[in-house]
From Swiss-Prot:
Pfam families: Ribosomal_L20. InterPro entries: Ribosomal_bL20, RIBOSOMAL_L20_CS, Ribosomal_protein_bL20_C. GO terms for biological process: ribosomal large subunit assembly; translation. Keywords: Ribonucleoprotein, Ribosomal protein, RNA-binding, rRNA-binding. PANTHER family: 39S RIBOSOMAL PROTEIN L20. GO terms for cellular component: ribonucleoprotein complex; ribosome. Belongs to the bacterial ribosomal protein bL20 family. One of its GO terms (molecular function) is structural constituent of ribosome. It comes from Nitrosomonas europaea (strain ATCC 19718 / CIP 103999 / KCTC 2705 / NBRC 14298). This is Large ribosomal subunit protein bL20. It comes from the Bacteria.
Length: 119
């Protein structure tokens, strides 16, 4: 069995990592050992932040709904309780969008919620 020289595969492996490290600063972009660590850490951050993004958006939506509801004389918790009692099936993303971009529609929903809470 002939001896296998690893030059081609090593070059390909290095090239793949250095391509992923493109745009990094300093030696992270052109020294294989450092670039490999940087790419691995970037992957860890990406994995973590894909999960955190969902939490952060939910927090943002809640803050927006709360601010808009308070302008109309309600707190977030009473507003969401009223949404459920009124049978309105809009999620937080849509409610936050309405609160920011269509205040008239959000006000109509709030009036329905107040009517639902009164019953």
């Amino acid at each position: 069995m002939p001896r296998v020289k690893r030059g081609v595969t090593a070059k390909a492996r290095h090239k793949k990592i250095l391509k992923l490290a493109k745009g990094y600063r300093g030696r992270r972009k052109n020294v294989y050992r450092i670039a490999k660590q940087a790419v691995m850490k970037a992957g860890q951050y990406a994995y973590r932040d894909r999960r955190q993004r969902k939490r952060q958006f939910r927090t943002l939506w809640i803050a927006r709904i709360n601010a808009a509801a308070r302008e109309l004389g309600m707190t977030y918790s009473t507003f969401m309780n009223g949404i459920r009692k009124a049978g309105i099936s809009l999620d937080r993303k849509i409610l936050a969008d309405l609160a920011v971009f269509d205040k008239v529609a959000f006000e109509k929903i709030t009036n329905q919620v107040k009517a639902g809470l009164a019953n």
